[in-house]
């Protein structure tokens, strides 16, 4: 009986399909391009299309003996294919994009799903830009969101392809202006995308102004800002220049809070502990504890996410693990490991690229430098430093990474309670060298030597100046000194100020034209500040409940 039903069903379907060829009892005429017409039946079209069903049941149209439908805006072969589909005919996949657009317009859900499945099988890293070009206006369809997600996640490599070079302005604007957190880019990388596209395409003044308005210029890193201001195309248009000038006022961005990377001596002395610190009230809250027993690691902030890299514990002389901690949701994610094991080193951040420089690898001191761009699957090595260094001071200014002082010999491992102190008189060779790495041209440069050899000095940049905070020994005692170097004049290092009270740990950060030095010890928070304009010191001591040993200070914007 079931076999007879199947035969009967196929016969009925075949009879309905044959109605299209018989050209009888037709009550709808579809006009397509070149003036061609397709005769069809309202009932059959309405059964498969919500669009046709709604149209044909409208009272005014329902009274018509023959209804005319204009679909000349679509590819005529696509329309023919869709009519064939509604009559249960086999259709070609040659023009699947055009069929999808027309099927979406006619609200034929089954055909849309079939087209999406076919396109998904065809779409990959190499074809996603081309596919998005054809479909970006249909972002409401799931397959288009899928293609966009693939494009956005692979942009670091796609911007070097011919397909990206030929991308139309609308696609570029769509990429840079997106505010969806799933594929939201950092401001600096938006600049990278824009400048790469401008190398191969013409853009009008109005279009460029629209793109620039999608970039948060004031919160742009210095390297990206420099590249943006010096671009020839941007400098062709007065309104774009004025837009950048208007947004240049706040060059030194003030952190709204600080992130303190510490060790909690009250619980587990080897676990890094992340605190958020209110600068004005001197109050803090613990947001995360990393479940890894490490000390002398490096830390940095990338787009308000904390990066913890390297370090060592008493089972491993040095590590290459890298972790990312989201400040808001406190989720820990493991990133690709560094190529080299490192401890007693620093992480520099320019745009969304992290640079791991020197440090100790076992009993060796490294000259190597490697970098990782957020979203990549691995680190890559860059040109070596002129000398091997660990426990140096470091800061970033524009496209340069400045390295001051450091140890050229292996430093023995210290207990967690002594993690901030290094005895410079025991088996250490301190450097007074000052070098910088040009991240645009990938070269190292030598600058005037520092006054003396120094280990772990505090280093910050302010406008065109580099400030170094360090301890200097004289015949009587040890003083905390601040030195300045102007990157425009190259006149060497100037002693700015000294203070008699030695700061036991020089964790420094720039905040509102002030060099701030924080130190947690036992149950006290010490906060010392020096204003670079007024040259005034301010010393504050605040008691708190927990015992922390501070490891680093990071800005939260």
From Swiss-Prot:
Enumerate the Kelch repeat regions by residue range: 305-352, 353-399, 415-464
Q: Which GO terms describe its cellular component?
A: host cell cytoplasm
Q: Could you provide one GO biological process annotation from this protein's UniProt record?
A: symbiont-mediated perturbation of host ubiquitin-like protein modification
Q: Which UniProt keywords apply?
A: Host cytoplasm, Host-virus interaction, Kelch repeat, Modulation of host E3 ubiquitin ligases by virus, Modulation of host ubiquitin pathway by virus, Repeat, Ubl conjugation pathway
InterPro entries in UniProt? BACK, BTB/POZ_dom, Kelch-typ_b-propeller, Kelch_1, SKP1/BTB/POZ_sf
> SUPFAM superfamilies under this entry?
Kelch motif (SSF117281), POZ domain (SSF54695)
Q: What range(s) does the BACK domain occupy?
A: 143-223
- Domain BTB spans what residues? 26-95
Q: Would I find Repeat among this entry's keywords?
A: yes
**Protein's cellular compartments:** Host cytoplasm
Q: What is known of its domains?
A: The BTB domain is responsible for the interaction with CUL3 while the Kelch repeat domains supposely serve to recruit the cellular substrates.
Tell me which PANTHER family the record gives: KELCH-LIKE PROTEIN 32, LD33804P
Q: What does this protein do?
A: Probable substrate-specific adapter of CUL3-containing E3 ubiquitin-protein ligases which mediate the ubiquitination and subsequent proteasomal degradation of host target proteins.
The protein depicted here goes by the name Kelch repeat and BTB domain-containing protein 2
The organism of origin for this protein: Cowpox virus (strain Brighton Red) (CPV)
> Which gene is transcribed and translated to give this protein?
KBTB2
